[in-house]
Amino acid sequence: MSKIYDWFEERLEIQSIADDISSKYVPPHVNIFYCFGGITFTCFLVQVATGFAMTFYYRPTVAEAFTSVQYLMTQVNFGWLIRSIHRWSASMMVLMMILHIFRVYLTGGFKKPRELTWVTGVLMAVCTVSFGVTGYSLPWDQIGYWAVKIVTGVPDAIPVIGQVLLELLRGGVAVGQSTLTRFYSLHTFVLPLFTAVFMLMHFLMIRKQGISGPL
């Protein structure tokens, strides 16, 4: 094992990276309320893992979506558990995100020089809400269908560009297969990609600037 470690150490300087991580200064005022961001990140990882597992069984078509979810819940070993964890972790992620935002705002963590950290956090909050909206529709049951119809119908009230936005979201005038395909793509590829990028930026800036001091 030592020879393998030495081989990697010679090329990647693993020890210096580990020393830098383990020796990072943590201010004495940091308490349990500073954990909300980390818990949100943990929930996101759970979402990725359980969501990936469900893609093996979910079929994003209006004819088979609901049936595939039923099959996952009733026939797949521990399928009900995986979907339940995904659902409850999603709720926990939203709750922890809200608490994290409140904590950062109340402790002044958005002030100079951490404005960009706040901006990336807000962008991740938008992604999180979008996850909820798009994921809610994927079972394609009555609740999901009408939720999509209402949400995608909101932009129609915008003057001039409203109809264009509506058709862009739905993939046409009416809610149908194109809408489900768009929401599935957003939920499983586009939003996770953007969220991962914003998270990386967020963490790098926190790493560079450190945790904000007390008020």
UniProtKB/Swiss-Prot annotation:
Coiled coil: none annotated. Heme b 2 binds at residues 86, 187. Signal peptide: none annotated. The chain crosses the membrane at residues 32-52, 90-110, 116-136, 186-206. Its cofactor is heme b; heme c. It is found in: Plastid, Chloroplast thylakoid membrane. Keywords: Chloroplast, Electron transport, Heme, Iron, Membrane, Metal-binding, Photosynthesis, Plastid, Thylakoid, Transmembrane, Transmembrane helix, Transport. The keyword Glycoprotein does not apply. The keyword S-adenosyl-L-methionine does not apply. It is a multi-pass membrane protein. One of its GO terms (biological process) is respiratory electron transport chain. NCBIfam families: PRK03735.1 (NF002990). The 4 large subunits of the cytochrome b6-f complex are cytochrome b6, subunit IV (17 kDa polypeptide, PetD), cytochrome f and the Rieske protein, while the 4 small subunits are PetG, PetL, PetM and PetN. The complex functions as a dimer. This is Cytochrome b6. It comes from Auxenochlorella protothecoides (Green microalga).
